[in-house]
């Protein structure tokens, strides 16, 4: 009986006599399209079933957070005093801890060593109405059941009787309706319901749970105003500025408001504003989900909409003709669009979590603020790089030139030189000018003439801030001018709390900006445009270029076309992705440095340090990186250790992983192949060791594989190093 060797999905690889079988097997495990015997229908079914597994993992993970906080955390103590108790994520059980470590990590009122939570879950659960450990346990158990249900659903949809057919997967209108109405619309409506029935009453000291849920009116007039059209009643009598969150003191009765600004005590958005926001989104999306033609012969057809989109001027050729089938038949195109959207949204989450904090007391937990910002920006970067990667794979595997003749997609390819060269020009302009300004300022400081620095006020950005109501700059226009119509309307009609919030120095709305911000803004613009240049060029040149017209025949990732064809190395679409990730990490480094340093000054009440030191490179290196590393690297020293020691160690460990990346990035395949052959020679001639044999002949990783291993270590090390720096430097200052 012959045992089937890994990988089962590729007979060719399973029969490979070398260790390539293992590494290529792992590398192509998720490339379902290219597996043996894969049909289009089976491909869709496999991916569909895997979505249930994904949801199960997410629910299980969230369930674990709830469970560990309920079991080992201090949620009930934190609720009593959110600003003075440090939230505990979970206990640490480590038999290696000496007494100093046990004492250093015993905090937050715990009886033994614990980890402090910097994820914001305490603030989130508190805001949505949870108050006891029992609430957390119930949530945890519910999510465990939900995860189980999703796992079962995933299994079920792989059974022949319950596998949807290909036509079901390609029914674009039904899917649009379902996702718009069902997922976005109804879930937003359900969330509005939770906020109105549970969270808002809890914020006013009224405890609503399943036992009194149906007997407690969320508004004194019940549904009467809704049915009589007197909707304004729901906005009357909002919570006052003196409201104590979680109590009835200073509370009102409004459930759907348009107050704007922040709750003065919690520094977070008004719950009644958020309920109103989700209700509006629910209405919009439920309506949107009834717009597409399915069973009843009414509504829009996506195909008809796209076929009709031809610019009357003729300047866009065939417009959107042919795009319906191109998108609907390409999973890579769809994934590219989805990743581009989600990546952008993820970056917006990073921006809004600190500028418009939705959770009570989040704004006063500085380490959590910094962590959430950094976390969401890095994730956005990876997701957006993935969008272009799948865009490139679409061009190689799925694009049909005949079906897209003269449409906007074909026209993008036809004028790709103009697109790529413009991005190149912008990147060069930004790079030389920004670096030139920074370096000039360094030289002036170094030569003892700091007054000769070139310091440019960002007047256009300040003008935009002023038009939204920021008065600090003295630009009298629109909302920053008390005699303007916009200002008058803003007082009564919409968001009366906005102008107070935007001119309050205790939050992060429309921060005051100067020459340092102007420079770092352009440094970040350089990073964004260079990353985009590499990604866009990779996708637009994926099918071929003047240098290599037959590139698409070589697939998504290839190292070179042999020794006989010079210049074909490093030009696969995969290589563009690989290079772009380095630029992405570089850019997000600048973004997070900027956010963190500027906020450290605001939180410490010392904004002048950023303003004075951020205009030259040595200022960034000395007053941000070096100065904020000092406490971190003293987590352990000759005199002992403290609670930052774990971050000190992780800082070193991150550097180690990062440096390991270069080992794979700098020394290439031939070096490893020679080394491996030497090691095999030695192994076979060493007593005892020579008893151990293997079937696969050891060979080095391919060039592309070595690059991906190098990239993975570079990325992981880079992020772990900064995570340790960020958490240690922030928590050391603010506890």
UniProtKB/Swiss-Prot annotation:
Binding residue positions for chlorophyll a B3: 663, 671
Q: Which Gene3D superfamilies match?
A: Photosystem I PsaA/PsaB
What Gene Ontology cellular-component terms does the record carry? chloroplast thylakoid membrane; photosystem I
Entry function = PsaA and PsaB bind P700, the primary electron donor of photosystem I (PSI), as well as the electron acceptors A0, A1 and FX. PSI is a plastocyanin/cytochrome c6-ferredoxin oxidoreductase, converting photonic excitation into a charge separation, which transfers an electron from the donor P700 chlorophyll pair to the spectroscopically characterized acceptors A0, A1, FX, FA and FB in turn. Oxidized P700 is reduced on the lumenal side of the thylakoid membrane by plastocyanin or cytochrome c6.
NCBIfam families linked to this entry:
psaB (TIGR01336)
Outline the subunit composition. The PsaA/B heterodimer binds the P700 chlorophyll special pair and subsequent electron acceptors. PSI consists of a core antenna complex that captures photons, and an electron transfer chain that converts photonic excitation into a charge separation. The eukaryotic PSI reaction center is composed of at least 11 subunits.
Listed name of the protein: Photosystem I P700 chlorophyll a apoprotein A2
């Amino acid at each position: 009986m012959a045992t089937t060797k890994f990988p089962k999905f590729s007979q060719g690889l399973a029969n490979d006599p070398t260790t390539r079988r293992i590494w290529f097997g792992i590398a192509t495990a998720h490339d379902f399209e290219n597996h043996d015997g894969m049909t289009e229908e089976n491909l869709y079914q496999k991916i569909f079933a895997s979505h249930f597994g994904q949801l199960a993992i997410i629910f299980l993970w969230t369930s674990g957070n709830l469970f560990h906080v309920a079991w080992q955390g201090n949620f009930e103590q934190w609720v009593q005093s959110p600003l003075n108790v440090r939230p505990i994520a979970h206990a640490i059980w480590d038999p290696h801890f000496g007494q100093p470590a046990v004492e250093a990590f015993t905090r937050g009122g715990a009886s033994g060593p614990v980890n402090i939570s910097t994820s914001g879950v305490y603030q989130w659960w508190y805001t949505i109405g949870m108050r006891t450990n029992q609430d957390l346990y119930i949530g945890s158990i519910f999510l465990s059941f939900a995860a189980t249900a999703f796992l079962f659903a995933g299994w079920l949809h792989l059974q022949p009787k319950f596998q949807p057919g290909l036509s079901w997967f390609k029914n674009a209108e039904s899917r649009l309706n379902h996702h718009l109405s069902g997922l976005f619309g109804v879930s937003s409506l359900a969330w509005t319901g939770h906020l109105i029935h549970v969270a808002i009453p809890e914020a006013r000291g009224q405890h609503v749970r399943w036992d009194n849920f149906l007997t407690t009116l969320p508004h004194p007039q019940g549904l009467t105003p809704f049915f009589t059209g007197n909707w304004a009643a729901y906005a009357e009598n909002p919570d006052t500025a003196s409201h104590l969150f979680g109590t009835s003191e200073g509370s009102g009765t409004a459930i759907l408001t348009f107050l704007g600004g922040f709750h003065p005590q919690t520094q977070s958005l008004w719950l009644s504003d958020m309920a109103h926001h989700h209700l509006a989104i629910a209405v919009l999306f439920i309506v949107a989900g009834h717009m597409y033609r399915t069973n009843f012969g009414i509504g829009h057809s996506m195909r008809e909409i796209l076929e009709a989109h031809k610019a009357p001027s003729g300047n866009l050729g065939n417009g959107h003709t042919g795009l319906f089938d191109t998108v609907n038949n390409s999973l890579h195109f769809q994934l590219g669009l989805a990743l581009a959207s989600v990546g952008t949204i993820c970056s917006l989450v990073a921006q809004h979590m600190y500028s418009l904090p939705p959770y009570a007391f989040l704004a006063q937990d500085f380490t959590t603020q910094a962590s959430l910002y950094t976390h969401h920006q890095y994730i956005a970067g990876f997701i957006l790089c993935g969008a272009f990667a799948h865009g490139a794979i679409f061009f190689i595997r799925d694009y049909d030139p005949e079906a897209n003749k003269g449409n906007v997609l074909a026209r993008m390819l036809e004028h790709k030189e103009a697109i790529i060269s413009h991005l190149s020009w912008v990147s060069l302009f930004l790079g030389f000018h920004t670096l030139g300004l920074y370096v000039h300022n360094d030289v002036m400081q170094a030569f003892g003439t700091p007054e000769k620095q070139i310091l440019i006020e960002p007047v256009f950005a300040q003008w935009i801030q002023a038009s939204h109501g920021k008065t600090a700059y003295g630009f009298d226009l629109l909302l920053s001018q008390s005699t303007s119509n916009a200002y008058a309307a803003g007082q009564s009609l919409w968001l009366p709390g906005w102008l107070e919030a935007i001119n309050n120095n205790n939050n992060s709305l429309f921060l005051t900006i100067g020459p340092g911000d102007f420079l770092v803004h352009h440094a970040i613009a350089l990073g964004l445009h260079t990353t985009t240049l590499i990604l866009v060029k990779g996708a637009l040149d994926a099918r071929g270029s003047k240098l290599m017209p037959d590139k698409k025949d070589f697939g998504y990732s290839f190292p070179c076309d042999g020794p006989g064809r010079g210049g074909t190395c490093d030009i696969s679409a995969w290589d563009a992705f690989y290079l772009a990730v380095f630029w992405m990490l570089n850019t997000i480094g600048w973004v997070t440095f900027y956010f963190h340093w500027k906020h450290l000054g605001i939180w410490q009440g010392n904004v002048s340090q950023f303003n004075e030191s951020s205009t030259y490179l040595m200022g960034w290196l000395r007053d941000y990186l070096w100065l904020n590393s000092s406490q971190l690297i003293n987590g352990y020293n000759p005199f002992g250790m403290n609670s930052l020691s774990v971050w000190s160690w992780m800082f070193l460990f991150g550097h180690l992983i990062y440096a390991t990346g270069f080992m794979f990035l700098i020394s290439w395949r031939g070096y490893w192949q020679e080394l491996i052959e030497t090691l095999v020679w030695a192994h076979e001639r060493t007593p005892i060791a020579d008893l151990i044999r293997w079937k696969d002949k050891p060979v080095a990783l391919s060039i592309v594989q070595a690059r991906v291993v190098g990239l993975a270590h570079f990325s992981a090390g880079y992020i772990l190093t900064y995570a340790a720096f960020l958490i240690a430097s922030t928590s050391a200052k603010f506890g």
